[in-house]
Amino acid sequence: QRQMCIRDSMHLVLDDKNFVFTSQLTPDAQGNMAYMQTPCRTPWRTVMVSDDARDILASNLILNLNEPCKYKDTSWIKPVKYIGVWWEMIAGGKPWAYTWDVPSVRLGETDYNKVKPNGQHPANNENVKKYIDFAAKHGFDQVLVEGWNIGWEDWFGHSKDYVFDFATPYPDFDIKMLNEYAQSKGVKLMMHHETSASIRNYERHMEAAYQLMNDYGYNAVKSGYVGNMIPRGEHHYGQWLNNHYLYAVTEAAKHHIMVNAHEAVRPTGLCRTYPNLIGNESARGTEYEAFSGNKPFHTTVLPFTRLQGGPMDYTPGIFEMDMSKLNPNSKSHVNSTLARQLALYVTMYSPLQMAADIPENYERFMDAFQFIKDVPVDWDESKYLEAEPGRYIVAARKAKGSNNWFIGCTSGEEGHLSTLKLDFLDNDKKYIATVYEDGKDAHYRNNPQSYGIRKGIVTAKSALKMKAVAGGGYAISIIEITDKTVLRDLKNLK
């Protein structure tokens, strides 16, 4: 059961324990479900049924139950592939905060120029420039920087109303210089607005925050809603909050800003109507791998559930699975092989894709990193070759404006064997296929970094025998041959 086009309404929460078709509506702080002015429309609720799981993945039912685009001009809305100052905090244990000297911050009063820096703050000029250089070298569009703004010392767990102003940088983050440096390299910075769930505070600062983005050249923001809501007693999925999430998107559109909301309500297809809602988290993403880990089957289920309502900023691309290598105090492990991390860029649809690991880990595996560099984030066509929720998904997508295809497979605990018929390719063309696959001894827990790369010629008559190990997968780039001289050095791939 799914819901679409939630506007001016509450979110429906299914009973996923008893597996019966009963549900509850998310109330407000007073226990009321909604305040509706008549005449009004309630959201669509649907049930999708098929005897072939691929049909559900290919369905556009939820998008089509939403209204067409509200914007006359969408030329400013662009797909984004990005890296960011984030994983070293989430997984590496580094702080968003600038100092340990201020246990209680007062906006406008606390003087950060008089405190002692903790020396561990990653959102600093030198580190951000390193990320900008890496992005420019490898063709990424943007660099996210979290922890750039004052207020992180006491941001969580205090039910604090005036928590951030979304405008004042820490002393070690030169917002003007860094934006100019990024733009000189052909890269943009991505803004970060963590609200600490203080919605009133975000809305009182929103216009100035968006204007600041315009002033410095930002065109995308990652927003966050961690914690208990303010106004106190409101819920993440109630009517009032759903109206806020949409308000943040429509106000951003006035400034030509794209929004990637984390911890917000699960999307219901509104990205068709408001396409600057370029991404959402709204499910267990890769960050949970740094906490307790996601089960291997997790990413074989999400495309049937969460992603039916809109693209997900899953933040894949982790190459170092042992979190103790980044943070000695961590016992967490990413439940995936390296090849599977590549496949997620195809199976987890989003026009906003992050290469989430730190640059140093990519530099250790540059041959595998090539797939992340090559894979598009905008597509003309999608095909679902094999699918069984909880077990495996094999997706193929055609790059926007080209004849190139990309294939991704993610598997659960059982692994998966495939014979991929490439009959969706053009009959009169030849292609170079580069296969990134699990090594023979690969395993998501014991040997996740074992992978192999092979390359050869394929056509529409080709059939590739593929294997994904437990918690593994594979990724394939299929590039149209335009220079026939390359044929001399390659054999047909099987």
Language model features by range: what are they?
Residues R2-I6:
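Short, small-residue-biased leader/transition segments that mark boundaries at the very start
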Residues C40-H138, Q142:
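An acidic-aromatic substrate-binding cleft motif
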Residues A135, V259, T347, I407, ...:
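Conserved, mostly hydrophobic/aromatic
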Residues G147-H333, T337:
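Aromatic- and carboxylate-enriched substrate-binding clefts and catalytic-loop regions
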Residues D357-F406, T410, H443-N447:
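Glycan-recognition and catalytic regions of carbohydrate-active enzymes
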Residues E388-Y431, Y474-S477:
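Carbohydrate-binding surface patches
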Residues V435-K461:
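Solvent-exposed beta-strand/loop surfaces of large extracellular or lumenal domains
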Residues K455-L493:
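C-terminal beta-strand-rich structural cap/linker in extracellular carbohydrate-active enzymes
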